[in-house]
A protein has these predicted regions:
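Short, compositionally biased
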Residues: 126, 131, 484-495
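N-terminal glycine-rich, Lys/His-bearing helix-loop that initiates the first secondary-structure elements
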Residues: 1-44, 456, 460, 492-493, ...
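Conserved PLP-enzyme active-site core in the AAT-like
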Residues: 7-12, 16-20, 80, 90-322, ...
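Conserved N-terminal alpha-helix of the aminotransferase class I/II PLP-enzyme fold
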Residues: 46-89
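Conserved C-terminal alpha-helix-loop-beta "cap" of PLP-dependent enzymes
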Residues: 310-491
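Short glycine-rich or small-residue beta-strand-to-loop segments that form or flank ligand, phosphate
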Residues: 57, 84-86, 164-167, 384-389
């Protein structure tokens, strides 16, 4: 795509492209679905719907009528005590949940793979972090679940912590056992916050299974949705996999111990005082569509995913990571992929594919698919993450499969197999207080400095060093080795600078 002179020019050109979206947002620009459900006017005349809090429009931070109804409808749909609408994304929800549950200067136990918003909350609240290392899939080098054992050890060592933050599913779809983690956190009197930004759809997969059972079908199913597994607060990015617009999300309060007013108060401080009615309207529409047509949408989504996985295993040189294993290379094996270590398995809506056997890196595979009009979400090592959503249709999967077959035929198995960069044993940095201000310094000169921004490697997508941890020569050497091997590192800029506390 040619460079554009403005955002509008880019958006116009992008909209005109004949491409298939396997990236966020989840609606996939499927205008027809909005139109079929009676909402074409919002898309056709958006400028007239862009208003502020005029009389009759209600007020987000003091909802009494229409916005209160949307909140109540979501609470009923997800089966929770209360729902807050988010117009600053799940980021605002994560920060609000942490600040509402952890007092200033308090302690939070959190996964090292937490969203950047969690690190912002640490600074805002002067909160002391206790980091838990996620498991790593040794074969595929993907960040996996937070184990109940790891949480138990952290709780034992830090009984004064107020809350626990877990990300599940993670970016690549790997999930933690929220039921066990909830039990562990509650045993120590701690609230469990779940960043379920990538799993807003999971509750509807539950409903679909329940409906099928009511019709007499045998549907083995264990719930994945944190709302049903005892979590106290769950943050969902409805725009990532469902049908609302980018930037809109919801925060679900489930546990009786959570002070709803405390969460609402923090959100009033964090979010804009001019909330977008377009975003809130899209949240309203998303709730209505999923309530009225959710079962139909989820059934088609599941059917299409099953179709894709069964066809994908027949393509020579293609590996599809699903659970703790991968099948492919033309095996034709349709025994759908073994479960991950965690008994409930991964989120099947996240498709991680590799053609390393044909000599393609993740970047090269992404480029080849983009050339064929298939746009993925993220490259991580030899893998490409394809994010499916409620807006994808069977034709999208057909085009993806056709493109993968073409790539397989073009490269053939005679090419030299792609060898991913070597992995090195990650050192464990010492902890300090999280700094509240920072400065840029060269990586090589950061020995003894306290990190301000996380330094993250992809894969597996977990920080090497988190905010509040101390840089050492061992850590610096480890990061330099990763960079020399061509690994993707976030937190080190093109000039080799990192941000540390002052």
């Amino acid at each position: 795509m040619e460079k554009s002179k403005s955002i509008y020019d880019f958006l116009k050109k992008n909209a005109a492209e004949d491409h298939i979206s396997f990236h966020m947002p989840g609606h996939k620009a499927r205008r027809q679905l909005y139109a079929e459900c009676g909402y074409a006017d919002l898309l056709n005349d958006a400028i007239r719907y862009d208003i502020t809090e005029i009389p009759g429009a209600d007020a987000l931070y003091h909802p009494k009528t229409t916005l209160r109804a949307v909140m109540d409808n979501y609470a009923e749909l997800y089966g929770v005590r209360h729902t807050e609408l988010l117009v600053n994304g799940a980021s605002a929800g994560i920060i609000a949940a942490i600040l509402a549950c952890v007092p200033v200067g308090g302690k939070l136990i959190l996964g090292r793979n937490s969203h950047h918003a969690a690190f912002s909350a640490l600074r805002l609240g002067g909160i002391n972090p206790v980091y838990i290392q996620p498991e790593t899939d040794a074969k595929y080098n993907l960040a996996a679940e937070i184990s109940a054992y790891a949480l138990e050890e952290a709780c034992k060592a830090n009984p004064d912590a107020s809350a626990v933050l877990i990300t599940s599913p993670n970016y690549c779809g790997m999930m933690s056992d929220i039921s066990l983690l909830t039990e562990t956190a509650h045993d120590y009197g701690m609230a469990l916050i779940v960043d379920q930004a990538h799993g807003a759809h999971l509750r509807f997969f539950d409903y679909d299974a329940k409906a099928a059972r009511e019709e007499g079908a045998f549907v083995p199913h264990i719930s994945h949705a944190a709302e049903t597994l005892g979590a106290d607060i769950v943050i969902n990015s409805t725009h990532k996999t469902l049908l609302s617009f980018t930037g809109s999300s919801i925060l679900n309060i489930c546990g009786d111990s959570i002070d709803i007013n405390a969460v609402s108060d923090v959100l009033r401080m964090l979010q804009t005082t001019s909330p977008s009615y377009l975003l809130m309207a899209s949240l309203d529409i998303n709730e209505k569509i999923m309530r009225e047509r959710g079962r139909e949408i989820i059934k088609s989504w599941k059917t299409d995913l099953d179709y894709f996985y069964k066809e994908a295993v027949k393509i020579s040189g293609l590996s599809v990571v699903q659970g703790g294993g991968a099948k492919g290379s033309g095996s034709g094996d349709e025994e759908c992929f073994p479960l991950y270590r965690y008994r409930e398995g991964p989120d099947v809506t996240k498709i991680n594919i590799s053609m390393a056997e044909l000599g393609l890196s993740g970047e090269r595979l992404e480029h080849e698919l983009r050339y064929k009009g298939i746009i993925g979400e993220m490259v991580h090592g030899e893998y490409l993450l394809l994010m499916t959503g409620a807006g994808n249709v069977r034709g999208d999967y057909d085009r993806l499969l056709a493109a993968l077959r073409d790539i397989s035929a073009s490269y053939g198995i005679s090419h030299t197999e792609y060898r991913p960069p070597r992995s090195f044993e990650a050192p464990r940095p010492e902890a300090s207080d999280v700094p509240t201000s920072g400065e840029l310094v060269p990586l090589y000169a950061s020995d003894g400095r306290v990190l301000y921004d996380p330094i993250i490697t992809y894969p597996p997508g977990t920080p090497i060093v988190c905010p509040g941890e101390i840089m050492s020569m061992e850590v610096i050497g480890y990061i330099q080795n990763l960079l020399s091997e061509g690994n993707r590192i976030s937190g080190v800029d093109e000039e080799g600078m990192i941000k540390v506390g002052v």
